[in-house]
Regions:
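Active-site loop-to-helix "anion-binding N-cap" substructures in soluble metabolic enzymes
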Residues: 1-252, 258-259, 264-330
Length: 330
């Protein structure tokens, strides 16, 4: 795809071109997808209007599987940058677009490739298991990749006495250690959204809604997971709610974007999002949202499809190594 990329786009990280306010963006996006043989992949944490126009909505594991099997020539990954990298690794011959290159991830940022390389050298004989929320460069240093949906299954596949470095999500690794009896070395990284959930906030909601079932993502801290009735990935939460129609109330400790899919699939159920902890004297948004996921907008998706940019590439020498642990996971 030959694209004339403007300097100002590169500086901003996305295509910033005016769009007629009278334009039906949802309809135009679907039209462009048809013209360009494109599909839109969206994570559960994106805003509802993006999930509504997506060809496929899922968690990291489901999105990776979809990227590996699609016949479409172009993928628009509405999530964060590492997800777009994963799409490119699994479908190197396809065009992968990330609507805003600024859509990073605090968890991925907590583990730099050069730091992991040094840590590996300090711990010879250890296998490296990396959470999918990592850059391609980190995956290239990894023996196997996991998601919150399959972490236990993957770790169980290793001999019990295998020496393992697990990262970058400390909370997920700590939980897996606790239920498997292992003693993996844990990288001290975390998701800035899930780190802010507290037991106190859950208890307050539980007092107001005593019949509500508490569901928490595995990226939450150990005390939060300890009071949760259901622990798992976003897909785990969604499936649980669908499979238990007798339950009419849930308390949800994860990014608020999942509420759209939960409410769409379970219209007769009430979901209460857990508010995050705000430090004393803190200012700003007291919301359980990932600002990176919310960088994806209809306007950016429309412009990205129209102009064919920003595309995501992975250096061949990194891609060759990084794709192996992902394929092993799948």
């Amino acid at each position: 795809m030959n694209v004339m990329v403007k300097k100002e786009w590169i500086e901003k990280g996305y295509v910033d071109e005016p769009v007629d306010e009278a334009l039906d963006l949802k309809a135009e996006i679907r039209k462009l997808c048809k013209e360009k043989d494109a599909i839109i992949l969206a994570h559960y944490y994106t805003v509802g209007e993006i999930q509504d126009i997506a060809d496929f909505v899922g968690d990291s594991l489901a999105l990776a599987r979809k990227a590996a099997e699609t016949d479409a020539q172009l993928m628009v990954m509405c999530g964060v940058h590492f997800m777009a990298e994963t799409c490119k690794l699994l479908s190197p011959d396809k065009i992968v677009i990330c609507p805003d290159l600024n859509a990073g991830c605090s968890l991925a940022d907590s583990c730099k490739a050069e730091d992991l390389k040094k840590y590996k050298e300090e711990h010879p004989g250890y296998k490296v298991v990396s959470y999918v929320n990592t850059t391609a460069a980190v995956k290239a240093l990894t023996d196997c990749v996991v998601t919150s949906g399959n972490a236990k299954k993957v770790i169980d596949s290793f001999p019990q006495d295998e020496k393992i470095i697990f990262g970058p999500d400390y909370n997920l690794g700590n939980y897996i250690n606790s239920i498997t009896g292992r003693n993996m070395l844990l990288w001290n990284g975390g998701c800035h959204v899930h780190e802010k959930f507290s037991v106190e906030a859950i208890v307050k909601l539980k007092q107001k809604h005593p019949e509500a079932v508490v569901m928490a993502h595995l990226e939450c801290k150990a005390p939060v997971l300890a009071v949760a009735d259901v622990k798992g990935s976003t897909a785990t939460m969604l499936h649980y709610a669908q499979e238990h129609p007798e339950i009419k109330e849930y308390i949800i400790a994860t990014e608020a974007g999942i509420l759209h899919e939960l409410e769409r699939n379970c219209p007769n159920v009430i979901f209460y999002p857990v508010p995050p902890e705000v430090s004393e004297g803190g200012v700003g948004c007291s919301c359980n949202e990932c600002e990176y996921m919310k960088m994806n907008t209809l306007k950016k998706i429309y412009n990205a499809l129209k102009f064919g940019w920003p595309t995501v590439e992975v250096a061949p020498e990194i891609a060759k190594k990084a794709v192996k642990p992902i394929e092993k996971m799948l």
